[in-house]
Amino acid sequence: MAQHRCVGGNGGAHTQPSLPALPAHLQSNTHLTGHLASRFHVSLPTAKLSSHAFISINTYTSSSKGQDGGKAGSAQGEAEDMADRAFLRLGHRSENQAILFLGESGSGKTTIRSHILTALLNKTSTPLSTKVSLAAYVFDTLTTTKTATTPTASKAGLFYELQYDTASTTSPLLIGGKLLDHRLERSRITDVPTGERNFHILYYILAGTSAAEKTHLGFGEPDAGTGSKRWRYLGHPTQLKVGINDAQGFQLFKTALRKLEFPRSEIAEICQVLASILHIGQLEFESSENTTVAGDESGGFSHEGGQITTVAKNKDVLAIVAAFLGVSAAELQTTLGYKTKIIHKERVTVMLDPAGARANANELARTLYSLLVAYVIENINQKICAPEEAIVNTVSIIDFPGFSQQSSTGSSLDLLLNNAAAEAMYNLTLQNFFDRKADLLETEEVSVPPTSYFDNSDAVKGLLKTGNGLLSILDDQTRRHRTDMQLLESLRKRFEGKNPAIGVSAATAKLPGSNFLSENTAASFTVRHFAGEVEYSIKGLVEENGEVISGDLLNLVNSTKSDFIARLFGQEALHTVTHPQERTTVMQASVSSKPMRAPSVMSRKIRPGTARTTRQRKESISGRQDTLDDIASERGDSRRPVNKPSEEGASGQFLHSLDNVTKSFHAQNTNAYFVFCLKPNDRRIANQFDSKCVRTQMQTFGIAEISQRIRSADFSVFLPFGEFLGLADVDTLLVGSEREKVEAVVDEKRWPTNEIQIGSTGVFISERCWMEIAQLSDMVTGRFGVPESEGGTPLANMPYGASKERLIAAGNSPYNNDKAKSGYFGSNDIDGRSDAGVSAFGGGDMFKNLDTREQMAERGNEKSMVEVEEFKDSPSRKRWVFITWMLTFFVPEFLIQHLGKMPRKDVRMAWREKLAINFIIWFSCLAAAFILVVFPMLVCPTQYVFTGEETLGLQRKRWKASYAAIRGQVFDIGSFIPSTPCPICHQSALHQYAGTDITGLFPVQVSALCKGTTGSVNPAVLLDYKDTNITDSPNVFNSQDLNSRYHDFRYFTNDTRPDWFSQMMITFRGTYKKGNIGYPAQVVQKMAQQRNAIAILNGRVYDFTKYIAGGAISGSSITNASTDQSLLDFMDPSVVRLFLGPARDDVTPLWDALRLTPTLRKSMQLCLDNLFYLGDVDTRNSVVCNFAKYFILAVTIILCSIIAFKFFAALQFGTKNMPQNLDKFIMCQIPAYTEDEESLRGAIDSAARMRYDDKRKLLIVVCDGMIIGQGNDRPTLRIVLDILGVSETVDPEPLSFESLGEGLKQHNMGKVYSGLYEVQGHIVPFLVVVKVGKPSEVSRPGNRGKRDSQMVIMRFLNRVHYNLPMSPLELEMYHQIRNIIGVNPTFYEYMLQIDADTVVAADSATRFVSAFLDDTRLIACCGETSIANAKSSFITMIQVYEYYISHNLSKAFESLFGSVTCLPGRFSMYRIRAAETGKPLFVSREVVDRYATIRVDTLHMKNLLHLGEDRYLTTLLLKYHNKYKTKYIYRAHAWTIAPDSWKVFLSQRRRWINSTVHNLIELIPMGQLCSFCCFSMRFIVFIDLLSTIIQPFTIAYIVYFIVRMVLTLDLVPVLAFVLLAAVYGLQAIIFILRRKWEMIAWMILYIIAMPIFSFGLPLYAFWHMDDFTWGNTRVVTGEKGKKAVVTDEGKFDPSSIPKKWEEYQSELWDAQTSKDVTRSEASGFSYATKAPVAVSEYGFPGSTPMAHTLPADLGAPRHTTHATHAILASRMSLAHSEMLMAGNRQSQFGGSQFNLPQSGSEMELSNLAGLPSDDALLAEIREILRTADLMTVTKKGVKQELERRFGVNLDSRRAYINSATEALLSGQL
């Protein structure tokens, strides 16, 4: 063993590098650990196990420095030594080499691997070597991360294959390489462990991009700044700065890709995908009530306002992601809010909450990153991989992540697969050391002493065994869509008591405090690995193993406009699952967990002269291997097909990849090397050796046992005697056999026995001995002393920590500056790309030649359209468009397009229509305001005048408003008194003047107020004021009042102030004036007749009585007694004569005719106003003003009269009689969408419990799509079926039918279930129709909306009654109703429609049907609906009274006219066909065709069909059946759920208001509405429309009324307000008489909320009239005014669905003859049977699902070979004698069914061939009796006539013919 000594000399124990060379007593883990410690402390961290294995201990410093600073004993030195020996064996023995790395995370495997790779590539330093090295760097960049134990933790298994040509030389030529990645740790992408990093590339791109690049990628924006923003997918911000040069790493990454021949544009695309992944992590989601109306909306009454959806908060980040993915931001948001799963073989769309949307976004991020890694690796392989036929030998470097006790990311699957790989790699090691060549040794008769060791075969078999290993079982359970508990049970059955390495916990456990077993939420299984026992949680493991990529994401990507994204999702790494019936439809997918290629040793062709087993190149490229059979196949289940790769889960794929690795490792002609990497301590402390830590690892890997084995046998080469002697160059003169010659050579060499053994035909020899005998030892000796200047790598001295900067050690760095062969960018690296060019690429903007983000977003929103229809606008539409443009011409298109963000022309047109409608509405409101407010003011302007009585009255009514008159002007002295304290009088004394004329208290100085004719008046002139007290009322104070002296400042007083009165009046007028004294014209005329000089001038009253009588002159200025008359006549005589003439009532014309100078006229006018003014003419009682006054009153009375009529209409009294039992057949339809189980059960149970004959009511539930609503744990279909008791095993075939959708969405598929539902003693037949969608539908399959759910039944009944071809689904519905339930569909006369969240009263159906029977002209009716959740919130409280009044006033009033304009779909019943004639009514052709309108592309049609489909259906009934009535039945009652949030309530009322407007517009032109003039329904409709659009003005008008009443106290406004109050009083009378006392409180709340109902809601509704989801269909204008409908949904061919009954019956017949007849899909029984018997309670033969039939007049031929089935099936009637006595069954659209004698059922089928059916016979009998003479007709005569008409013998049908004839003649039919 001396040859194993180190070159370091003989200094001590540490000088021994070989552990097996140590003495036997040191061959224990403790002693070996001590020996490693002694070497570690002298900088020798390595030790040899044999020539093909060594141990390396991570020093956490330099990996290239050994003892004395040289390579000897260092990790790099040992790695290069192993690489040299592998290369020699590769060249000289043409063997495949495999190097396997074992070690825990942080032990330095990645570094040692890089050293070995560098050393191997140094052997052939070529441009290809550079690319191979670059490929390794790129792989590490994408798959390594920083963990708590190491900065370069590999998180993907690596199988790196170097491909050589060794056929022609012993110096192998590198011709290619192949990267095989195994199972990337995808959970880390979105769940970064605390204190660790994500994959390095994500940090690189964030740090290494330039400013321009950051802006493009969305990193440099203020809200996305890298400095202050925390990136969800990058962990804690401290991880951005952990000593790793991320910026340099990114530049190296880009350079590596360029040198690997990736185009610059593709590198930029890769960076965009990486950026989008980071941005996906930033998306924040919230729940939002989506109030935007879509055509596929469905659900109950509470869903009308909108449904809860999940939306992105940060729309800017969403836009960035969408732009980089090349999709629409809206579609991306929708896709993230939904997720399609496969549950029980059905595709179901789950409506996600914010947490679910976040998980969905994480799935998208993981998918993108996984596909990107696969794409880059596959493209690298395409660049560097050699053709398989050229490959002779390979060197495989195998490095899987180390064993781990727990998952840092929380992923049980990643932990399981990672540890399974570690277990497999360790098992390979054990087999190589202990079991390999065992057979050959035995054949060669060589005995080797056995060595005991820990064998992990149990764990390996338990985990990896094909078929029934743990991973295979997990994969099988995933493919079977089993639950976690079912997986646990399968593991228990497989391993319990059978495999000691795997233990399974109990599936059930007792919870604390409970004695009952419940599901064990902590269930797990335990695996005893070679490195320890690990417990794996079972929770979520099956789903995680599926790694299902939702079909929604794939559907989204299918629409991408990015070629790179399309290539990314188009690669083979994405395994898709297609629909079995439509292979082009991808339902889901998964990213491969195994490499896309296989090892070359497994896949290449056999070369001449070699014995290597290979596969075809085609298999290599695809990388697909035949999958393993599942456990079911071992059980003999031959019905299950062999699993396909696309259906494999992660565990199955990973198992296959491990199998490939294992097989390639064990392949013939493969030599294995092993590198054991150990950690010196657990704390990553440099140069510290923890003996316990190392000893544990030694024990884990069984180093001591391996060393013992090597001491016994260290063989790696087997040489036949001849080859051995050839290498030994034995002297030919030596005599003896080959064996003897070999023995002689061995004796001469003196090799240890553990390194050489002689067999019977050859020699087992160690690699060291082989190299010696082959004289190759010199090629690997002395290499450690090479100085750096002679070819050493200057970067090789970098410590392990250097990998923080470059991920891999310097020796493997593609950026080495070596000038010798060890460098890849040295002188020998010539690949045509200079570093300068690469640097320029990295330093600039890589996106400058690509589209901007805005351009990407715009391209992502584009749609590929196809024309599906061509049409022309109607004349009315053209007129409306013209009006719209006339009203909105001033708004330019570019503003709507850019500012309004409406790129589509039809959306812009709808906005214009909305604006035009709003203009019309606002104009109507303004017109109403003008008529009711402005018009009266214009006709009779407001006068601020007061009569004397009013002045006095105000004083009496309101003390605070104390008014007084001064010279014809009225002032508020009540405000003056407190504001101006009087020092000489008390305030109470002043109040005596309130309501009086106090002009006498204020004497005036005449000369100060009038200039006369000369320009001045003598100051001594006095003129008394003529008061207006003509009624002798004590409200006038004269100048004799004592207080007048305080205001007398005339000329003759001691205190003269001529201007005091003028100044005082100016102040008074500005502050306290309220108006003027008013004199009606008749009063003025009366005063003039009393010899008063009084007249009207310009609407003002002037009095010259005192002036004409003569004034006075103050005595102080006139000395004589005579008065100078000239001083007193200061007024112009012509003016005075005006007041003396005969026509003195109005002298304005005479005044205008006076010839006065302007100065004199102005002077006279001033005198008139100041001295003679009495007041204004009071015109308030004139004819014009009375008209204006009573006009308002008349309008108010008209409006109130309508409400009063509604009140009287609501007064419907009578006894609460219970209707008798009725025998009419009714259907009860319930459309279901995403309601919860409580709502659905309430609706279904209430319908089933209705007090109506159970046999005569059919419960129909239509499920709109396969959707799981938020808060539900099952799809709606499953909830409904569970309520009805249908087993999960029932799975009918989906059948096609026509739906209401765009393009190809018109083709839908559905399933039909039927059976009996038993609840509280009721046994009710039911029919469930679920719309599952075509196979190509991924998101919300089958969902088309509530209107489509109604159309499913309406169209079916329409085709039944009109004898039209049916779709396959409708044929199946017919079969289920007729043959399984046992009722002919034509018998159903009425349909009750209720919503899924509505509960109906028990007597509802009876009351409805009674109304229909009482009035045969009644086509539809509705009942009263109350709120079930009245007290949920204030929003629901304010709706209670409104609901009550809207039914009991509005609908009751409309019911008087027989024209209820809105029959709510939540609770209404319709007449299907006329009672007398059988004519279809509710399902008539006109109604169905109009209601099934698909092209809903205008604002009007969207408001009709998307907002108020129920109201529009009522409109159609009134329009096409105008002779029939619609009524309100107030005694029929139901309860529903009302919106309890403001947003949903607002949206719901928007829908109601807008649909009301548009439906009333449809009704107004109808001329058939009842009665005439103002008593007509048309007038009421017009008033309703008008009141709807002017509601905002109405509330404003009421406010105006209140204000006017408070301020003016006029009689008329008070009366109008009293009338309004009386109206609400009438409403109160209604609920008082009905003892609804609680309505008092609800009414008060409603009145408080009136501004909301009448003002806020209408304004919001009118402006949001175009708030729709416009879908993908639009209208484009073509040539000559033609318009075309285009859509991206494809073109639908209606002929592809309908099918003739003959075809369907023929198919069913063929199917029946080929297999056994099955029972009902739901229960297996026919109706009214409670046991699986073939005879019903009526004695008829049992019906079978395949015995389909229709009436003869429904398309079935009169003569058919399948008539027997028609006869037998027709006997399966729901009622026999009861139906015969029901009456009114005969109809040209359907006949009855009759009992047949027992012998009829026993006749041979051959005798019945070609006979007519019962229905055909019945129809002909009815026709014969209609025209025959009933006095002479006989049964025999009827039979003979039938035989003549049908042309067949009917003896066998005599009994039926006789019974039918009797029934018709007796009136039973």
UniProtKB/Swiss-Prot annotation:
Residue stretches of biased makeup (Polar residues): 583-593
Gene source species: Pyricularia grisea
UniProt superkingdom: Eukaryota
Membrane topology note: Multi-pass membrane protein
Regions that span the bilayer: 880-900, 919-939, 1191-1211, 1579-1599, 1612-1632, 1639-1659
Free-text function comment from the UniProt entry: Polymerizes chitin, a structural polymer of the cell wall and septum, by transferring the sugar moiety of UDP-GlcNAc to the non-reducing end of the growing chitin polymer. Involved in mycelial growth.
Record's keyword terms, sorted: Actin-binding, ATP-binding, Cell membrane, Glycoprotein, Glycosyltransferase, Membrane, Motor protein, Myosin, Nucleotide-binding, Transferase, Transmembrane, Transmembrane helix
Induction text: Constantly expressed between 2 and 5 days of mycelial growth.
Subcellular location: Cell membrane; Cell septum; Cell tip
Glycosylation (residues): N122, N290, N427, N558, N660, N1029, N1054, N1120, N1448, N1554
DEK-C domain ranges (all copies): 1811-1866
Free-text note on domains in this protein's UniProt record: The N-terminal myosin motor-like domain (MMD) does not seem to have motor activity but is indispensable for polarized cell wall synthesis via binding to actin that ensures the proper localization to the hyphal tips and septation sites near actin structures.
Region feature (Disordered): 579-653
Protein name stated in the entry: Chitin synthase csm1
Matching CDD domains: MYSc_Myo17
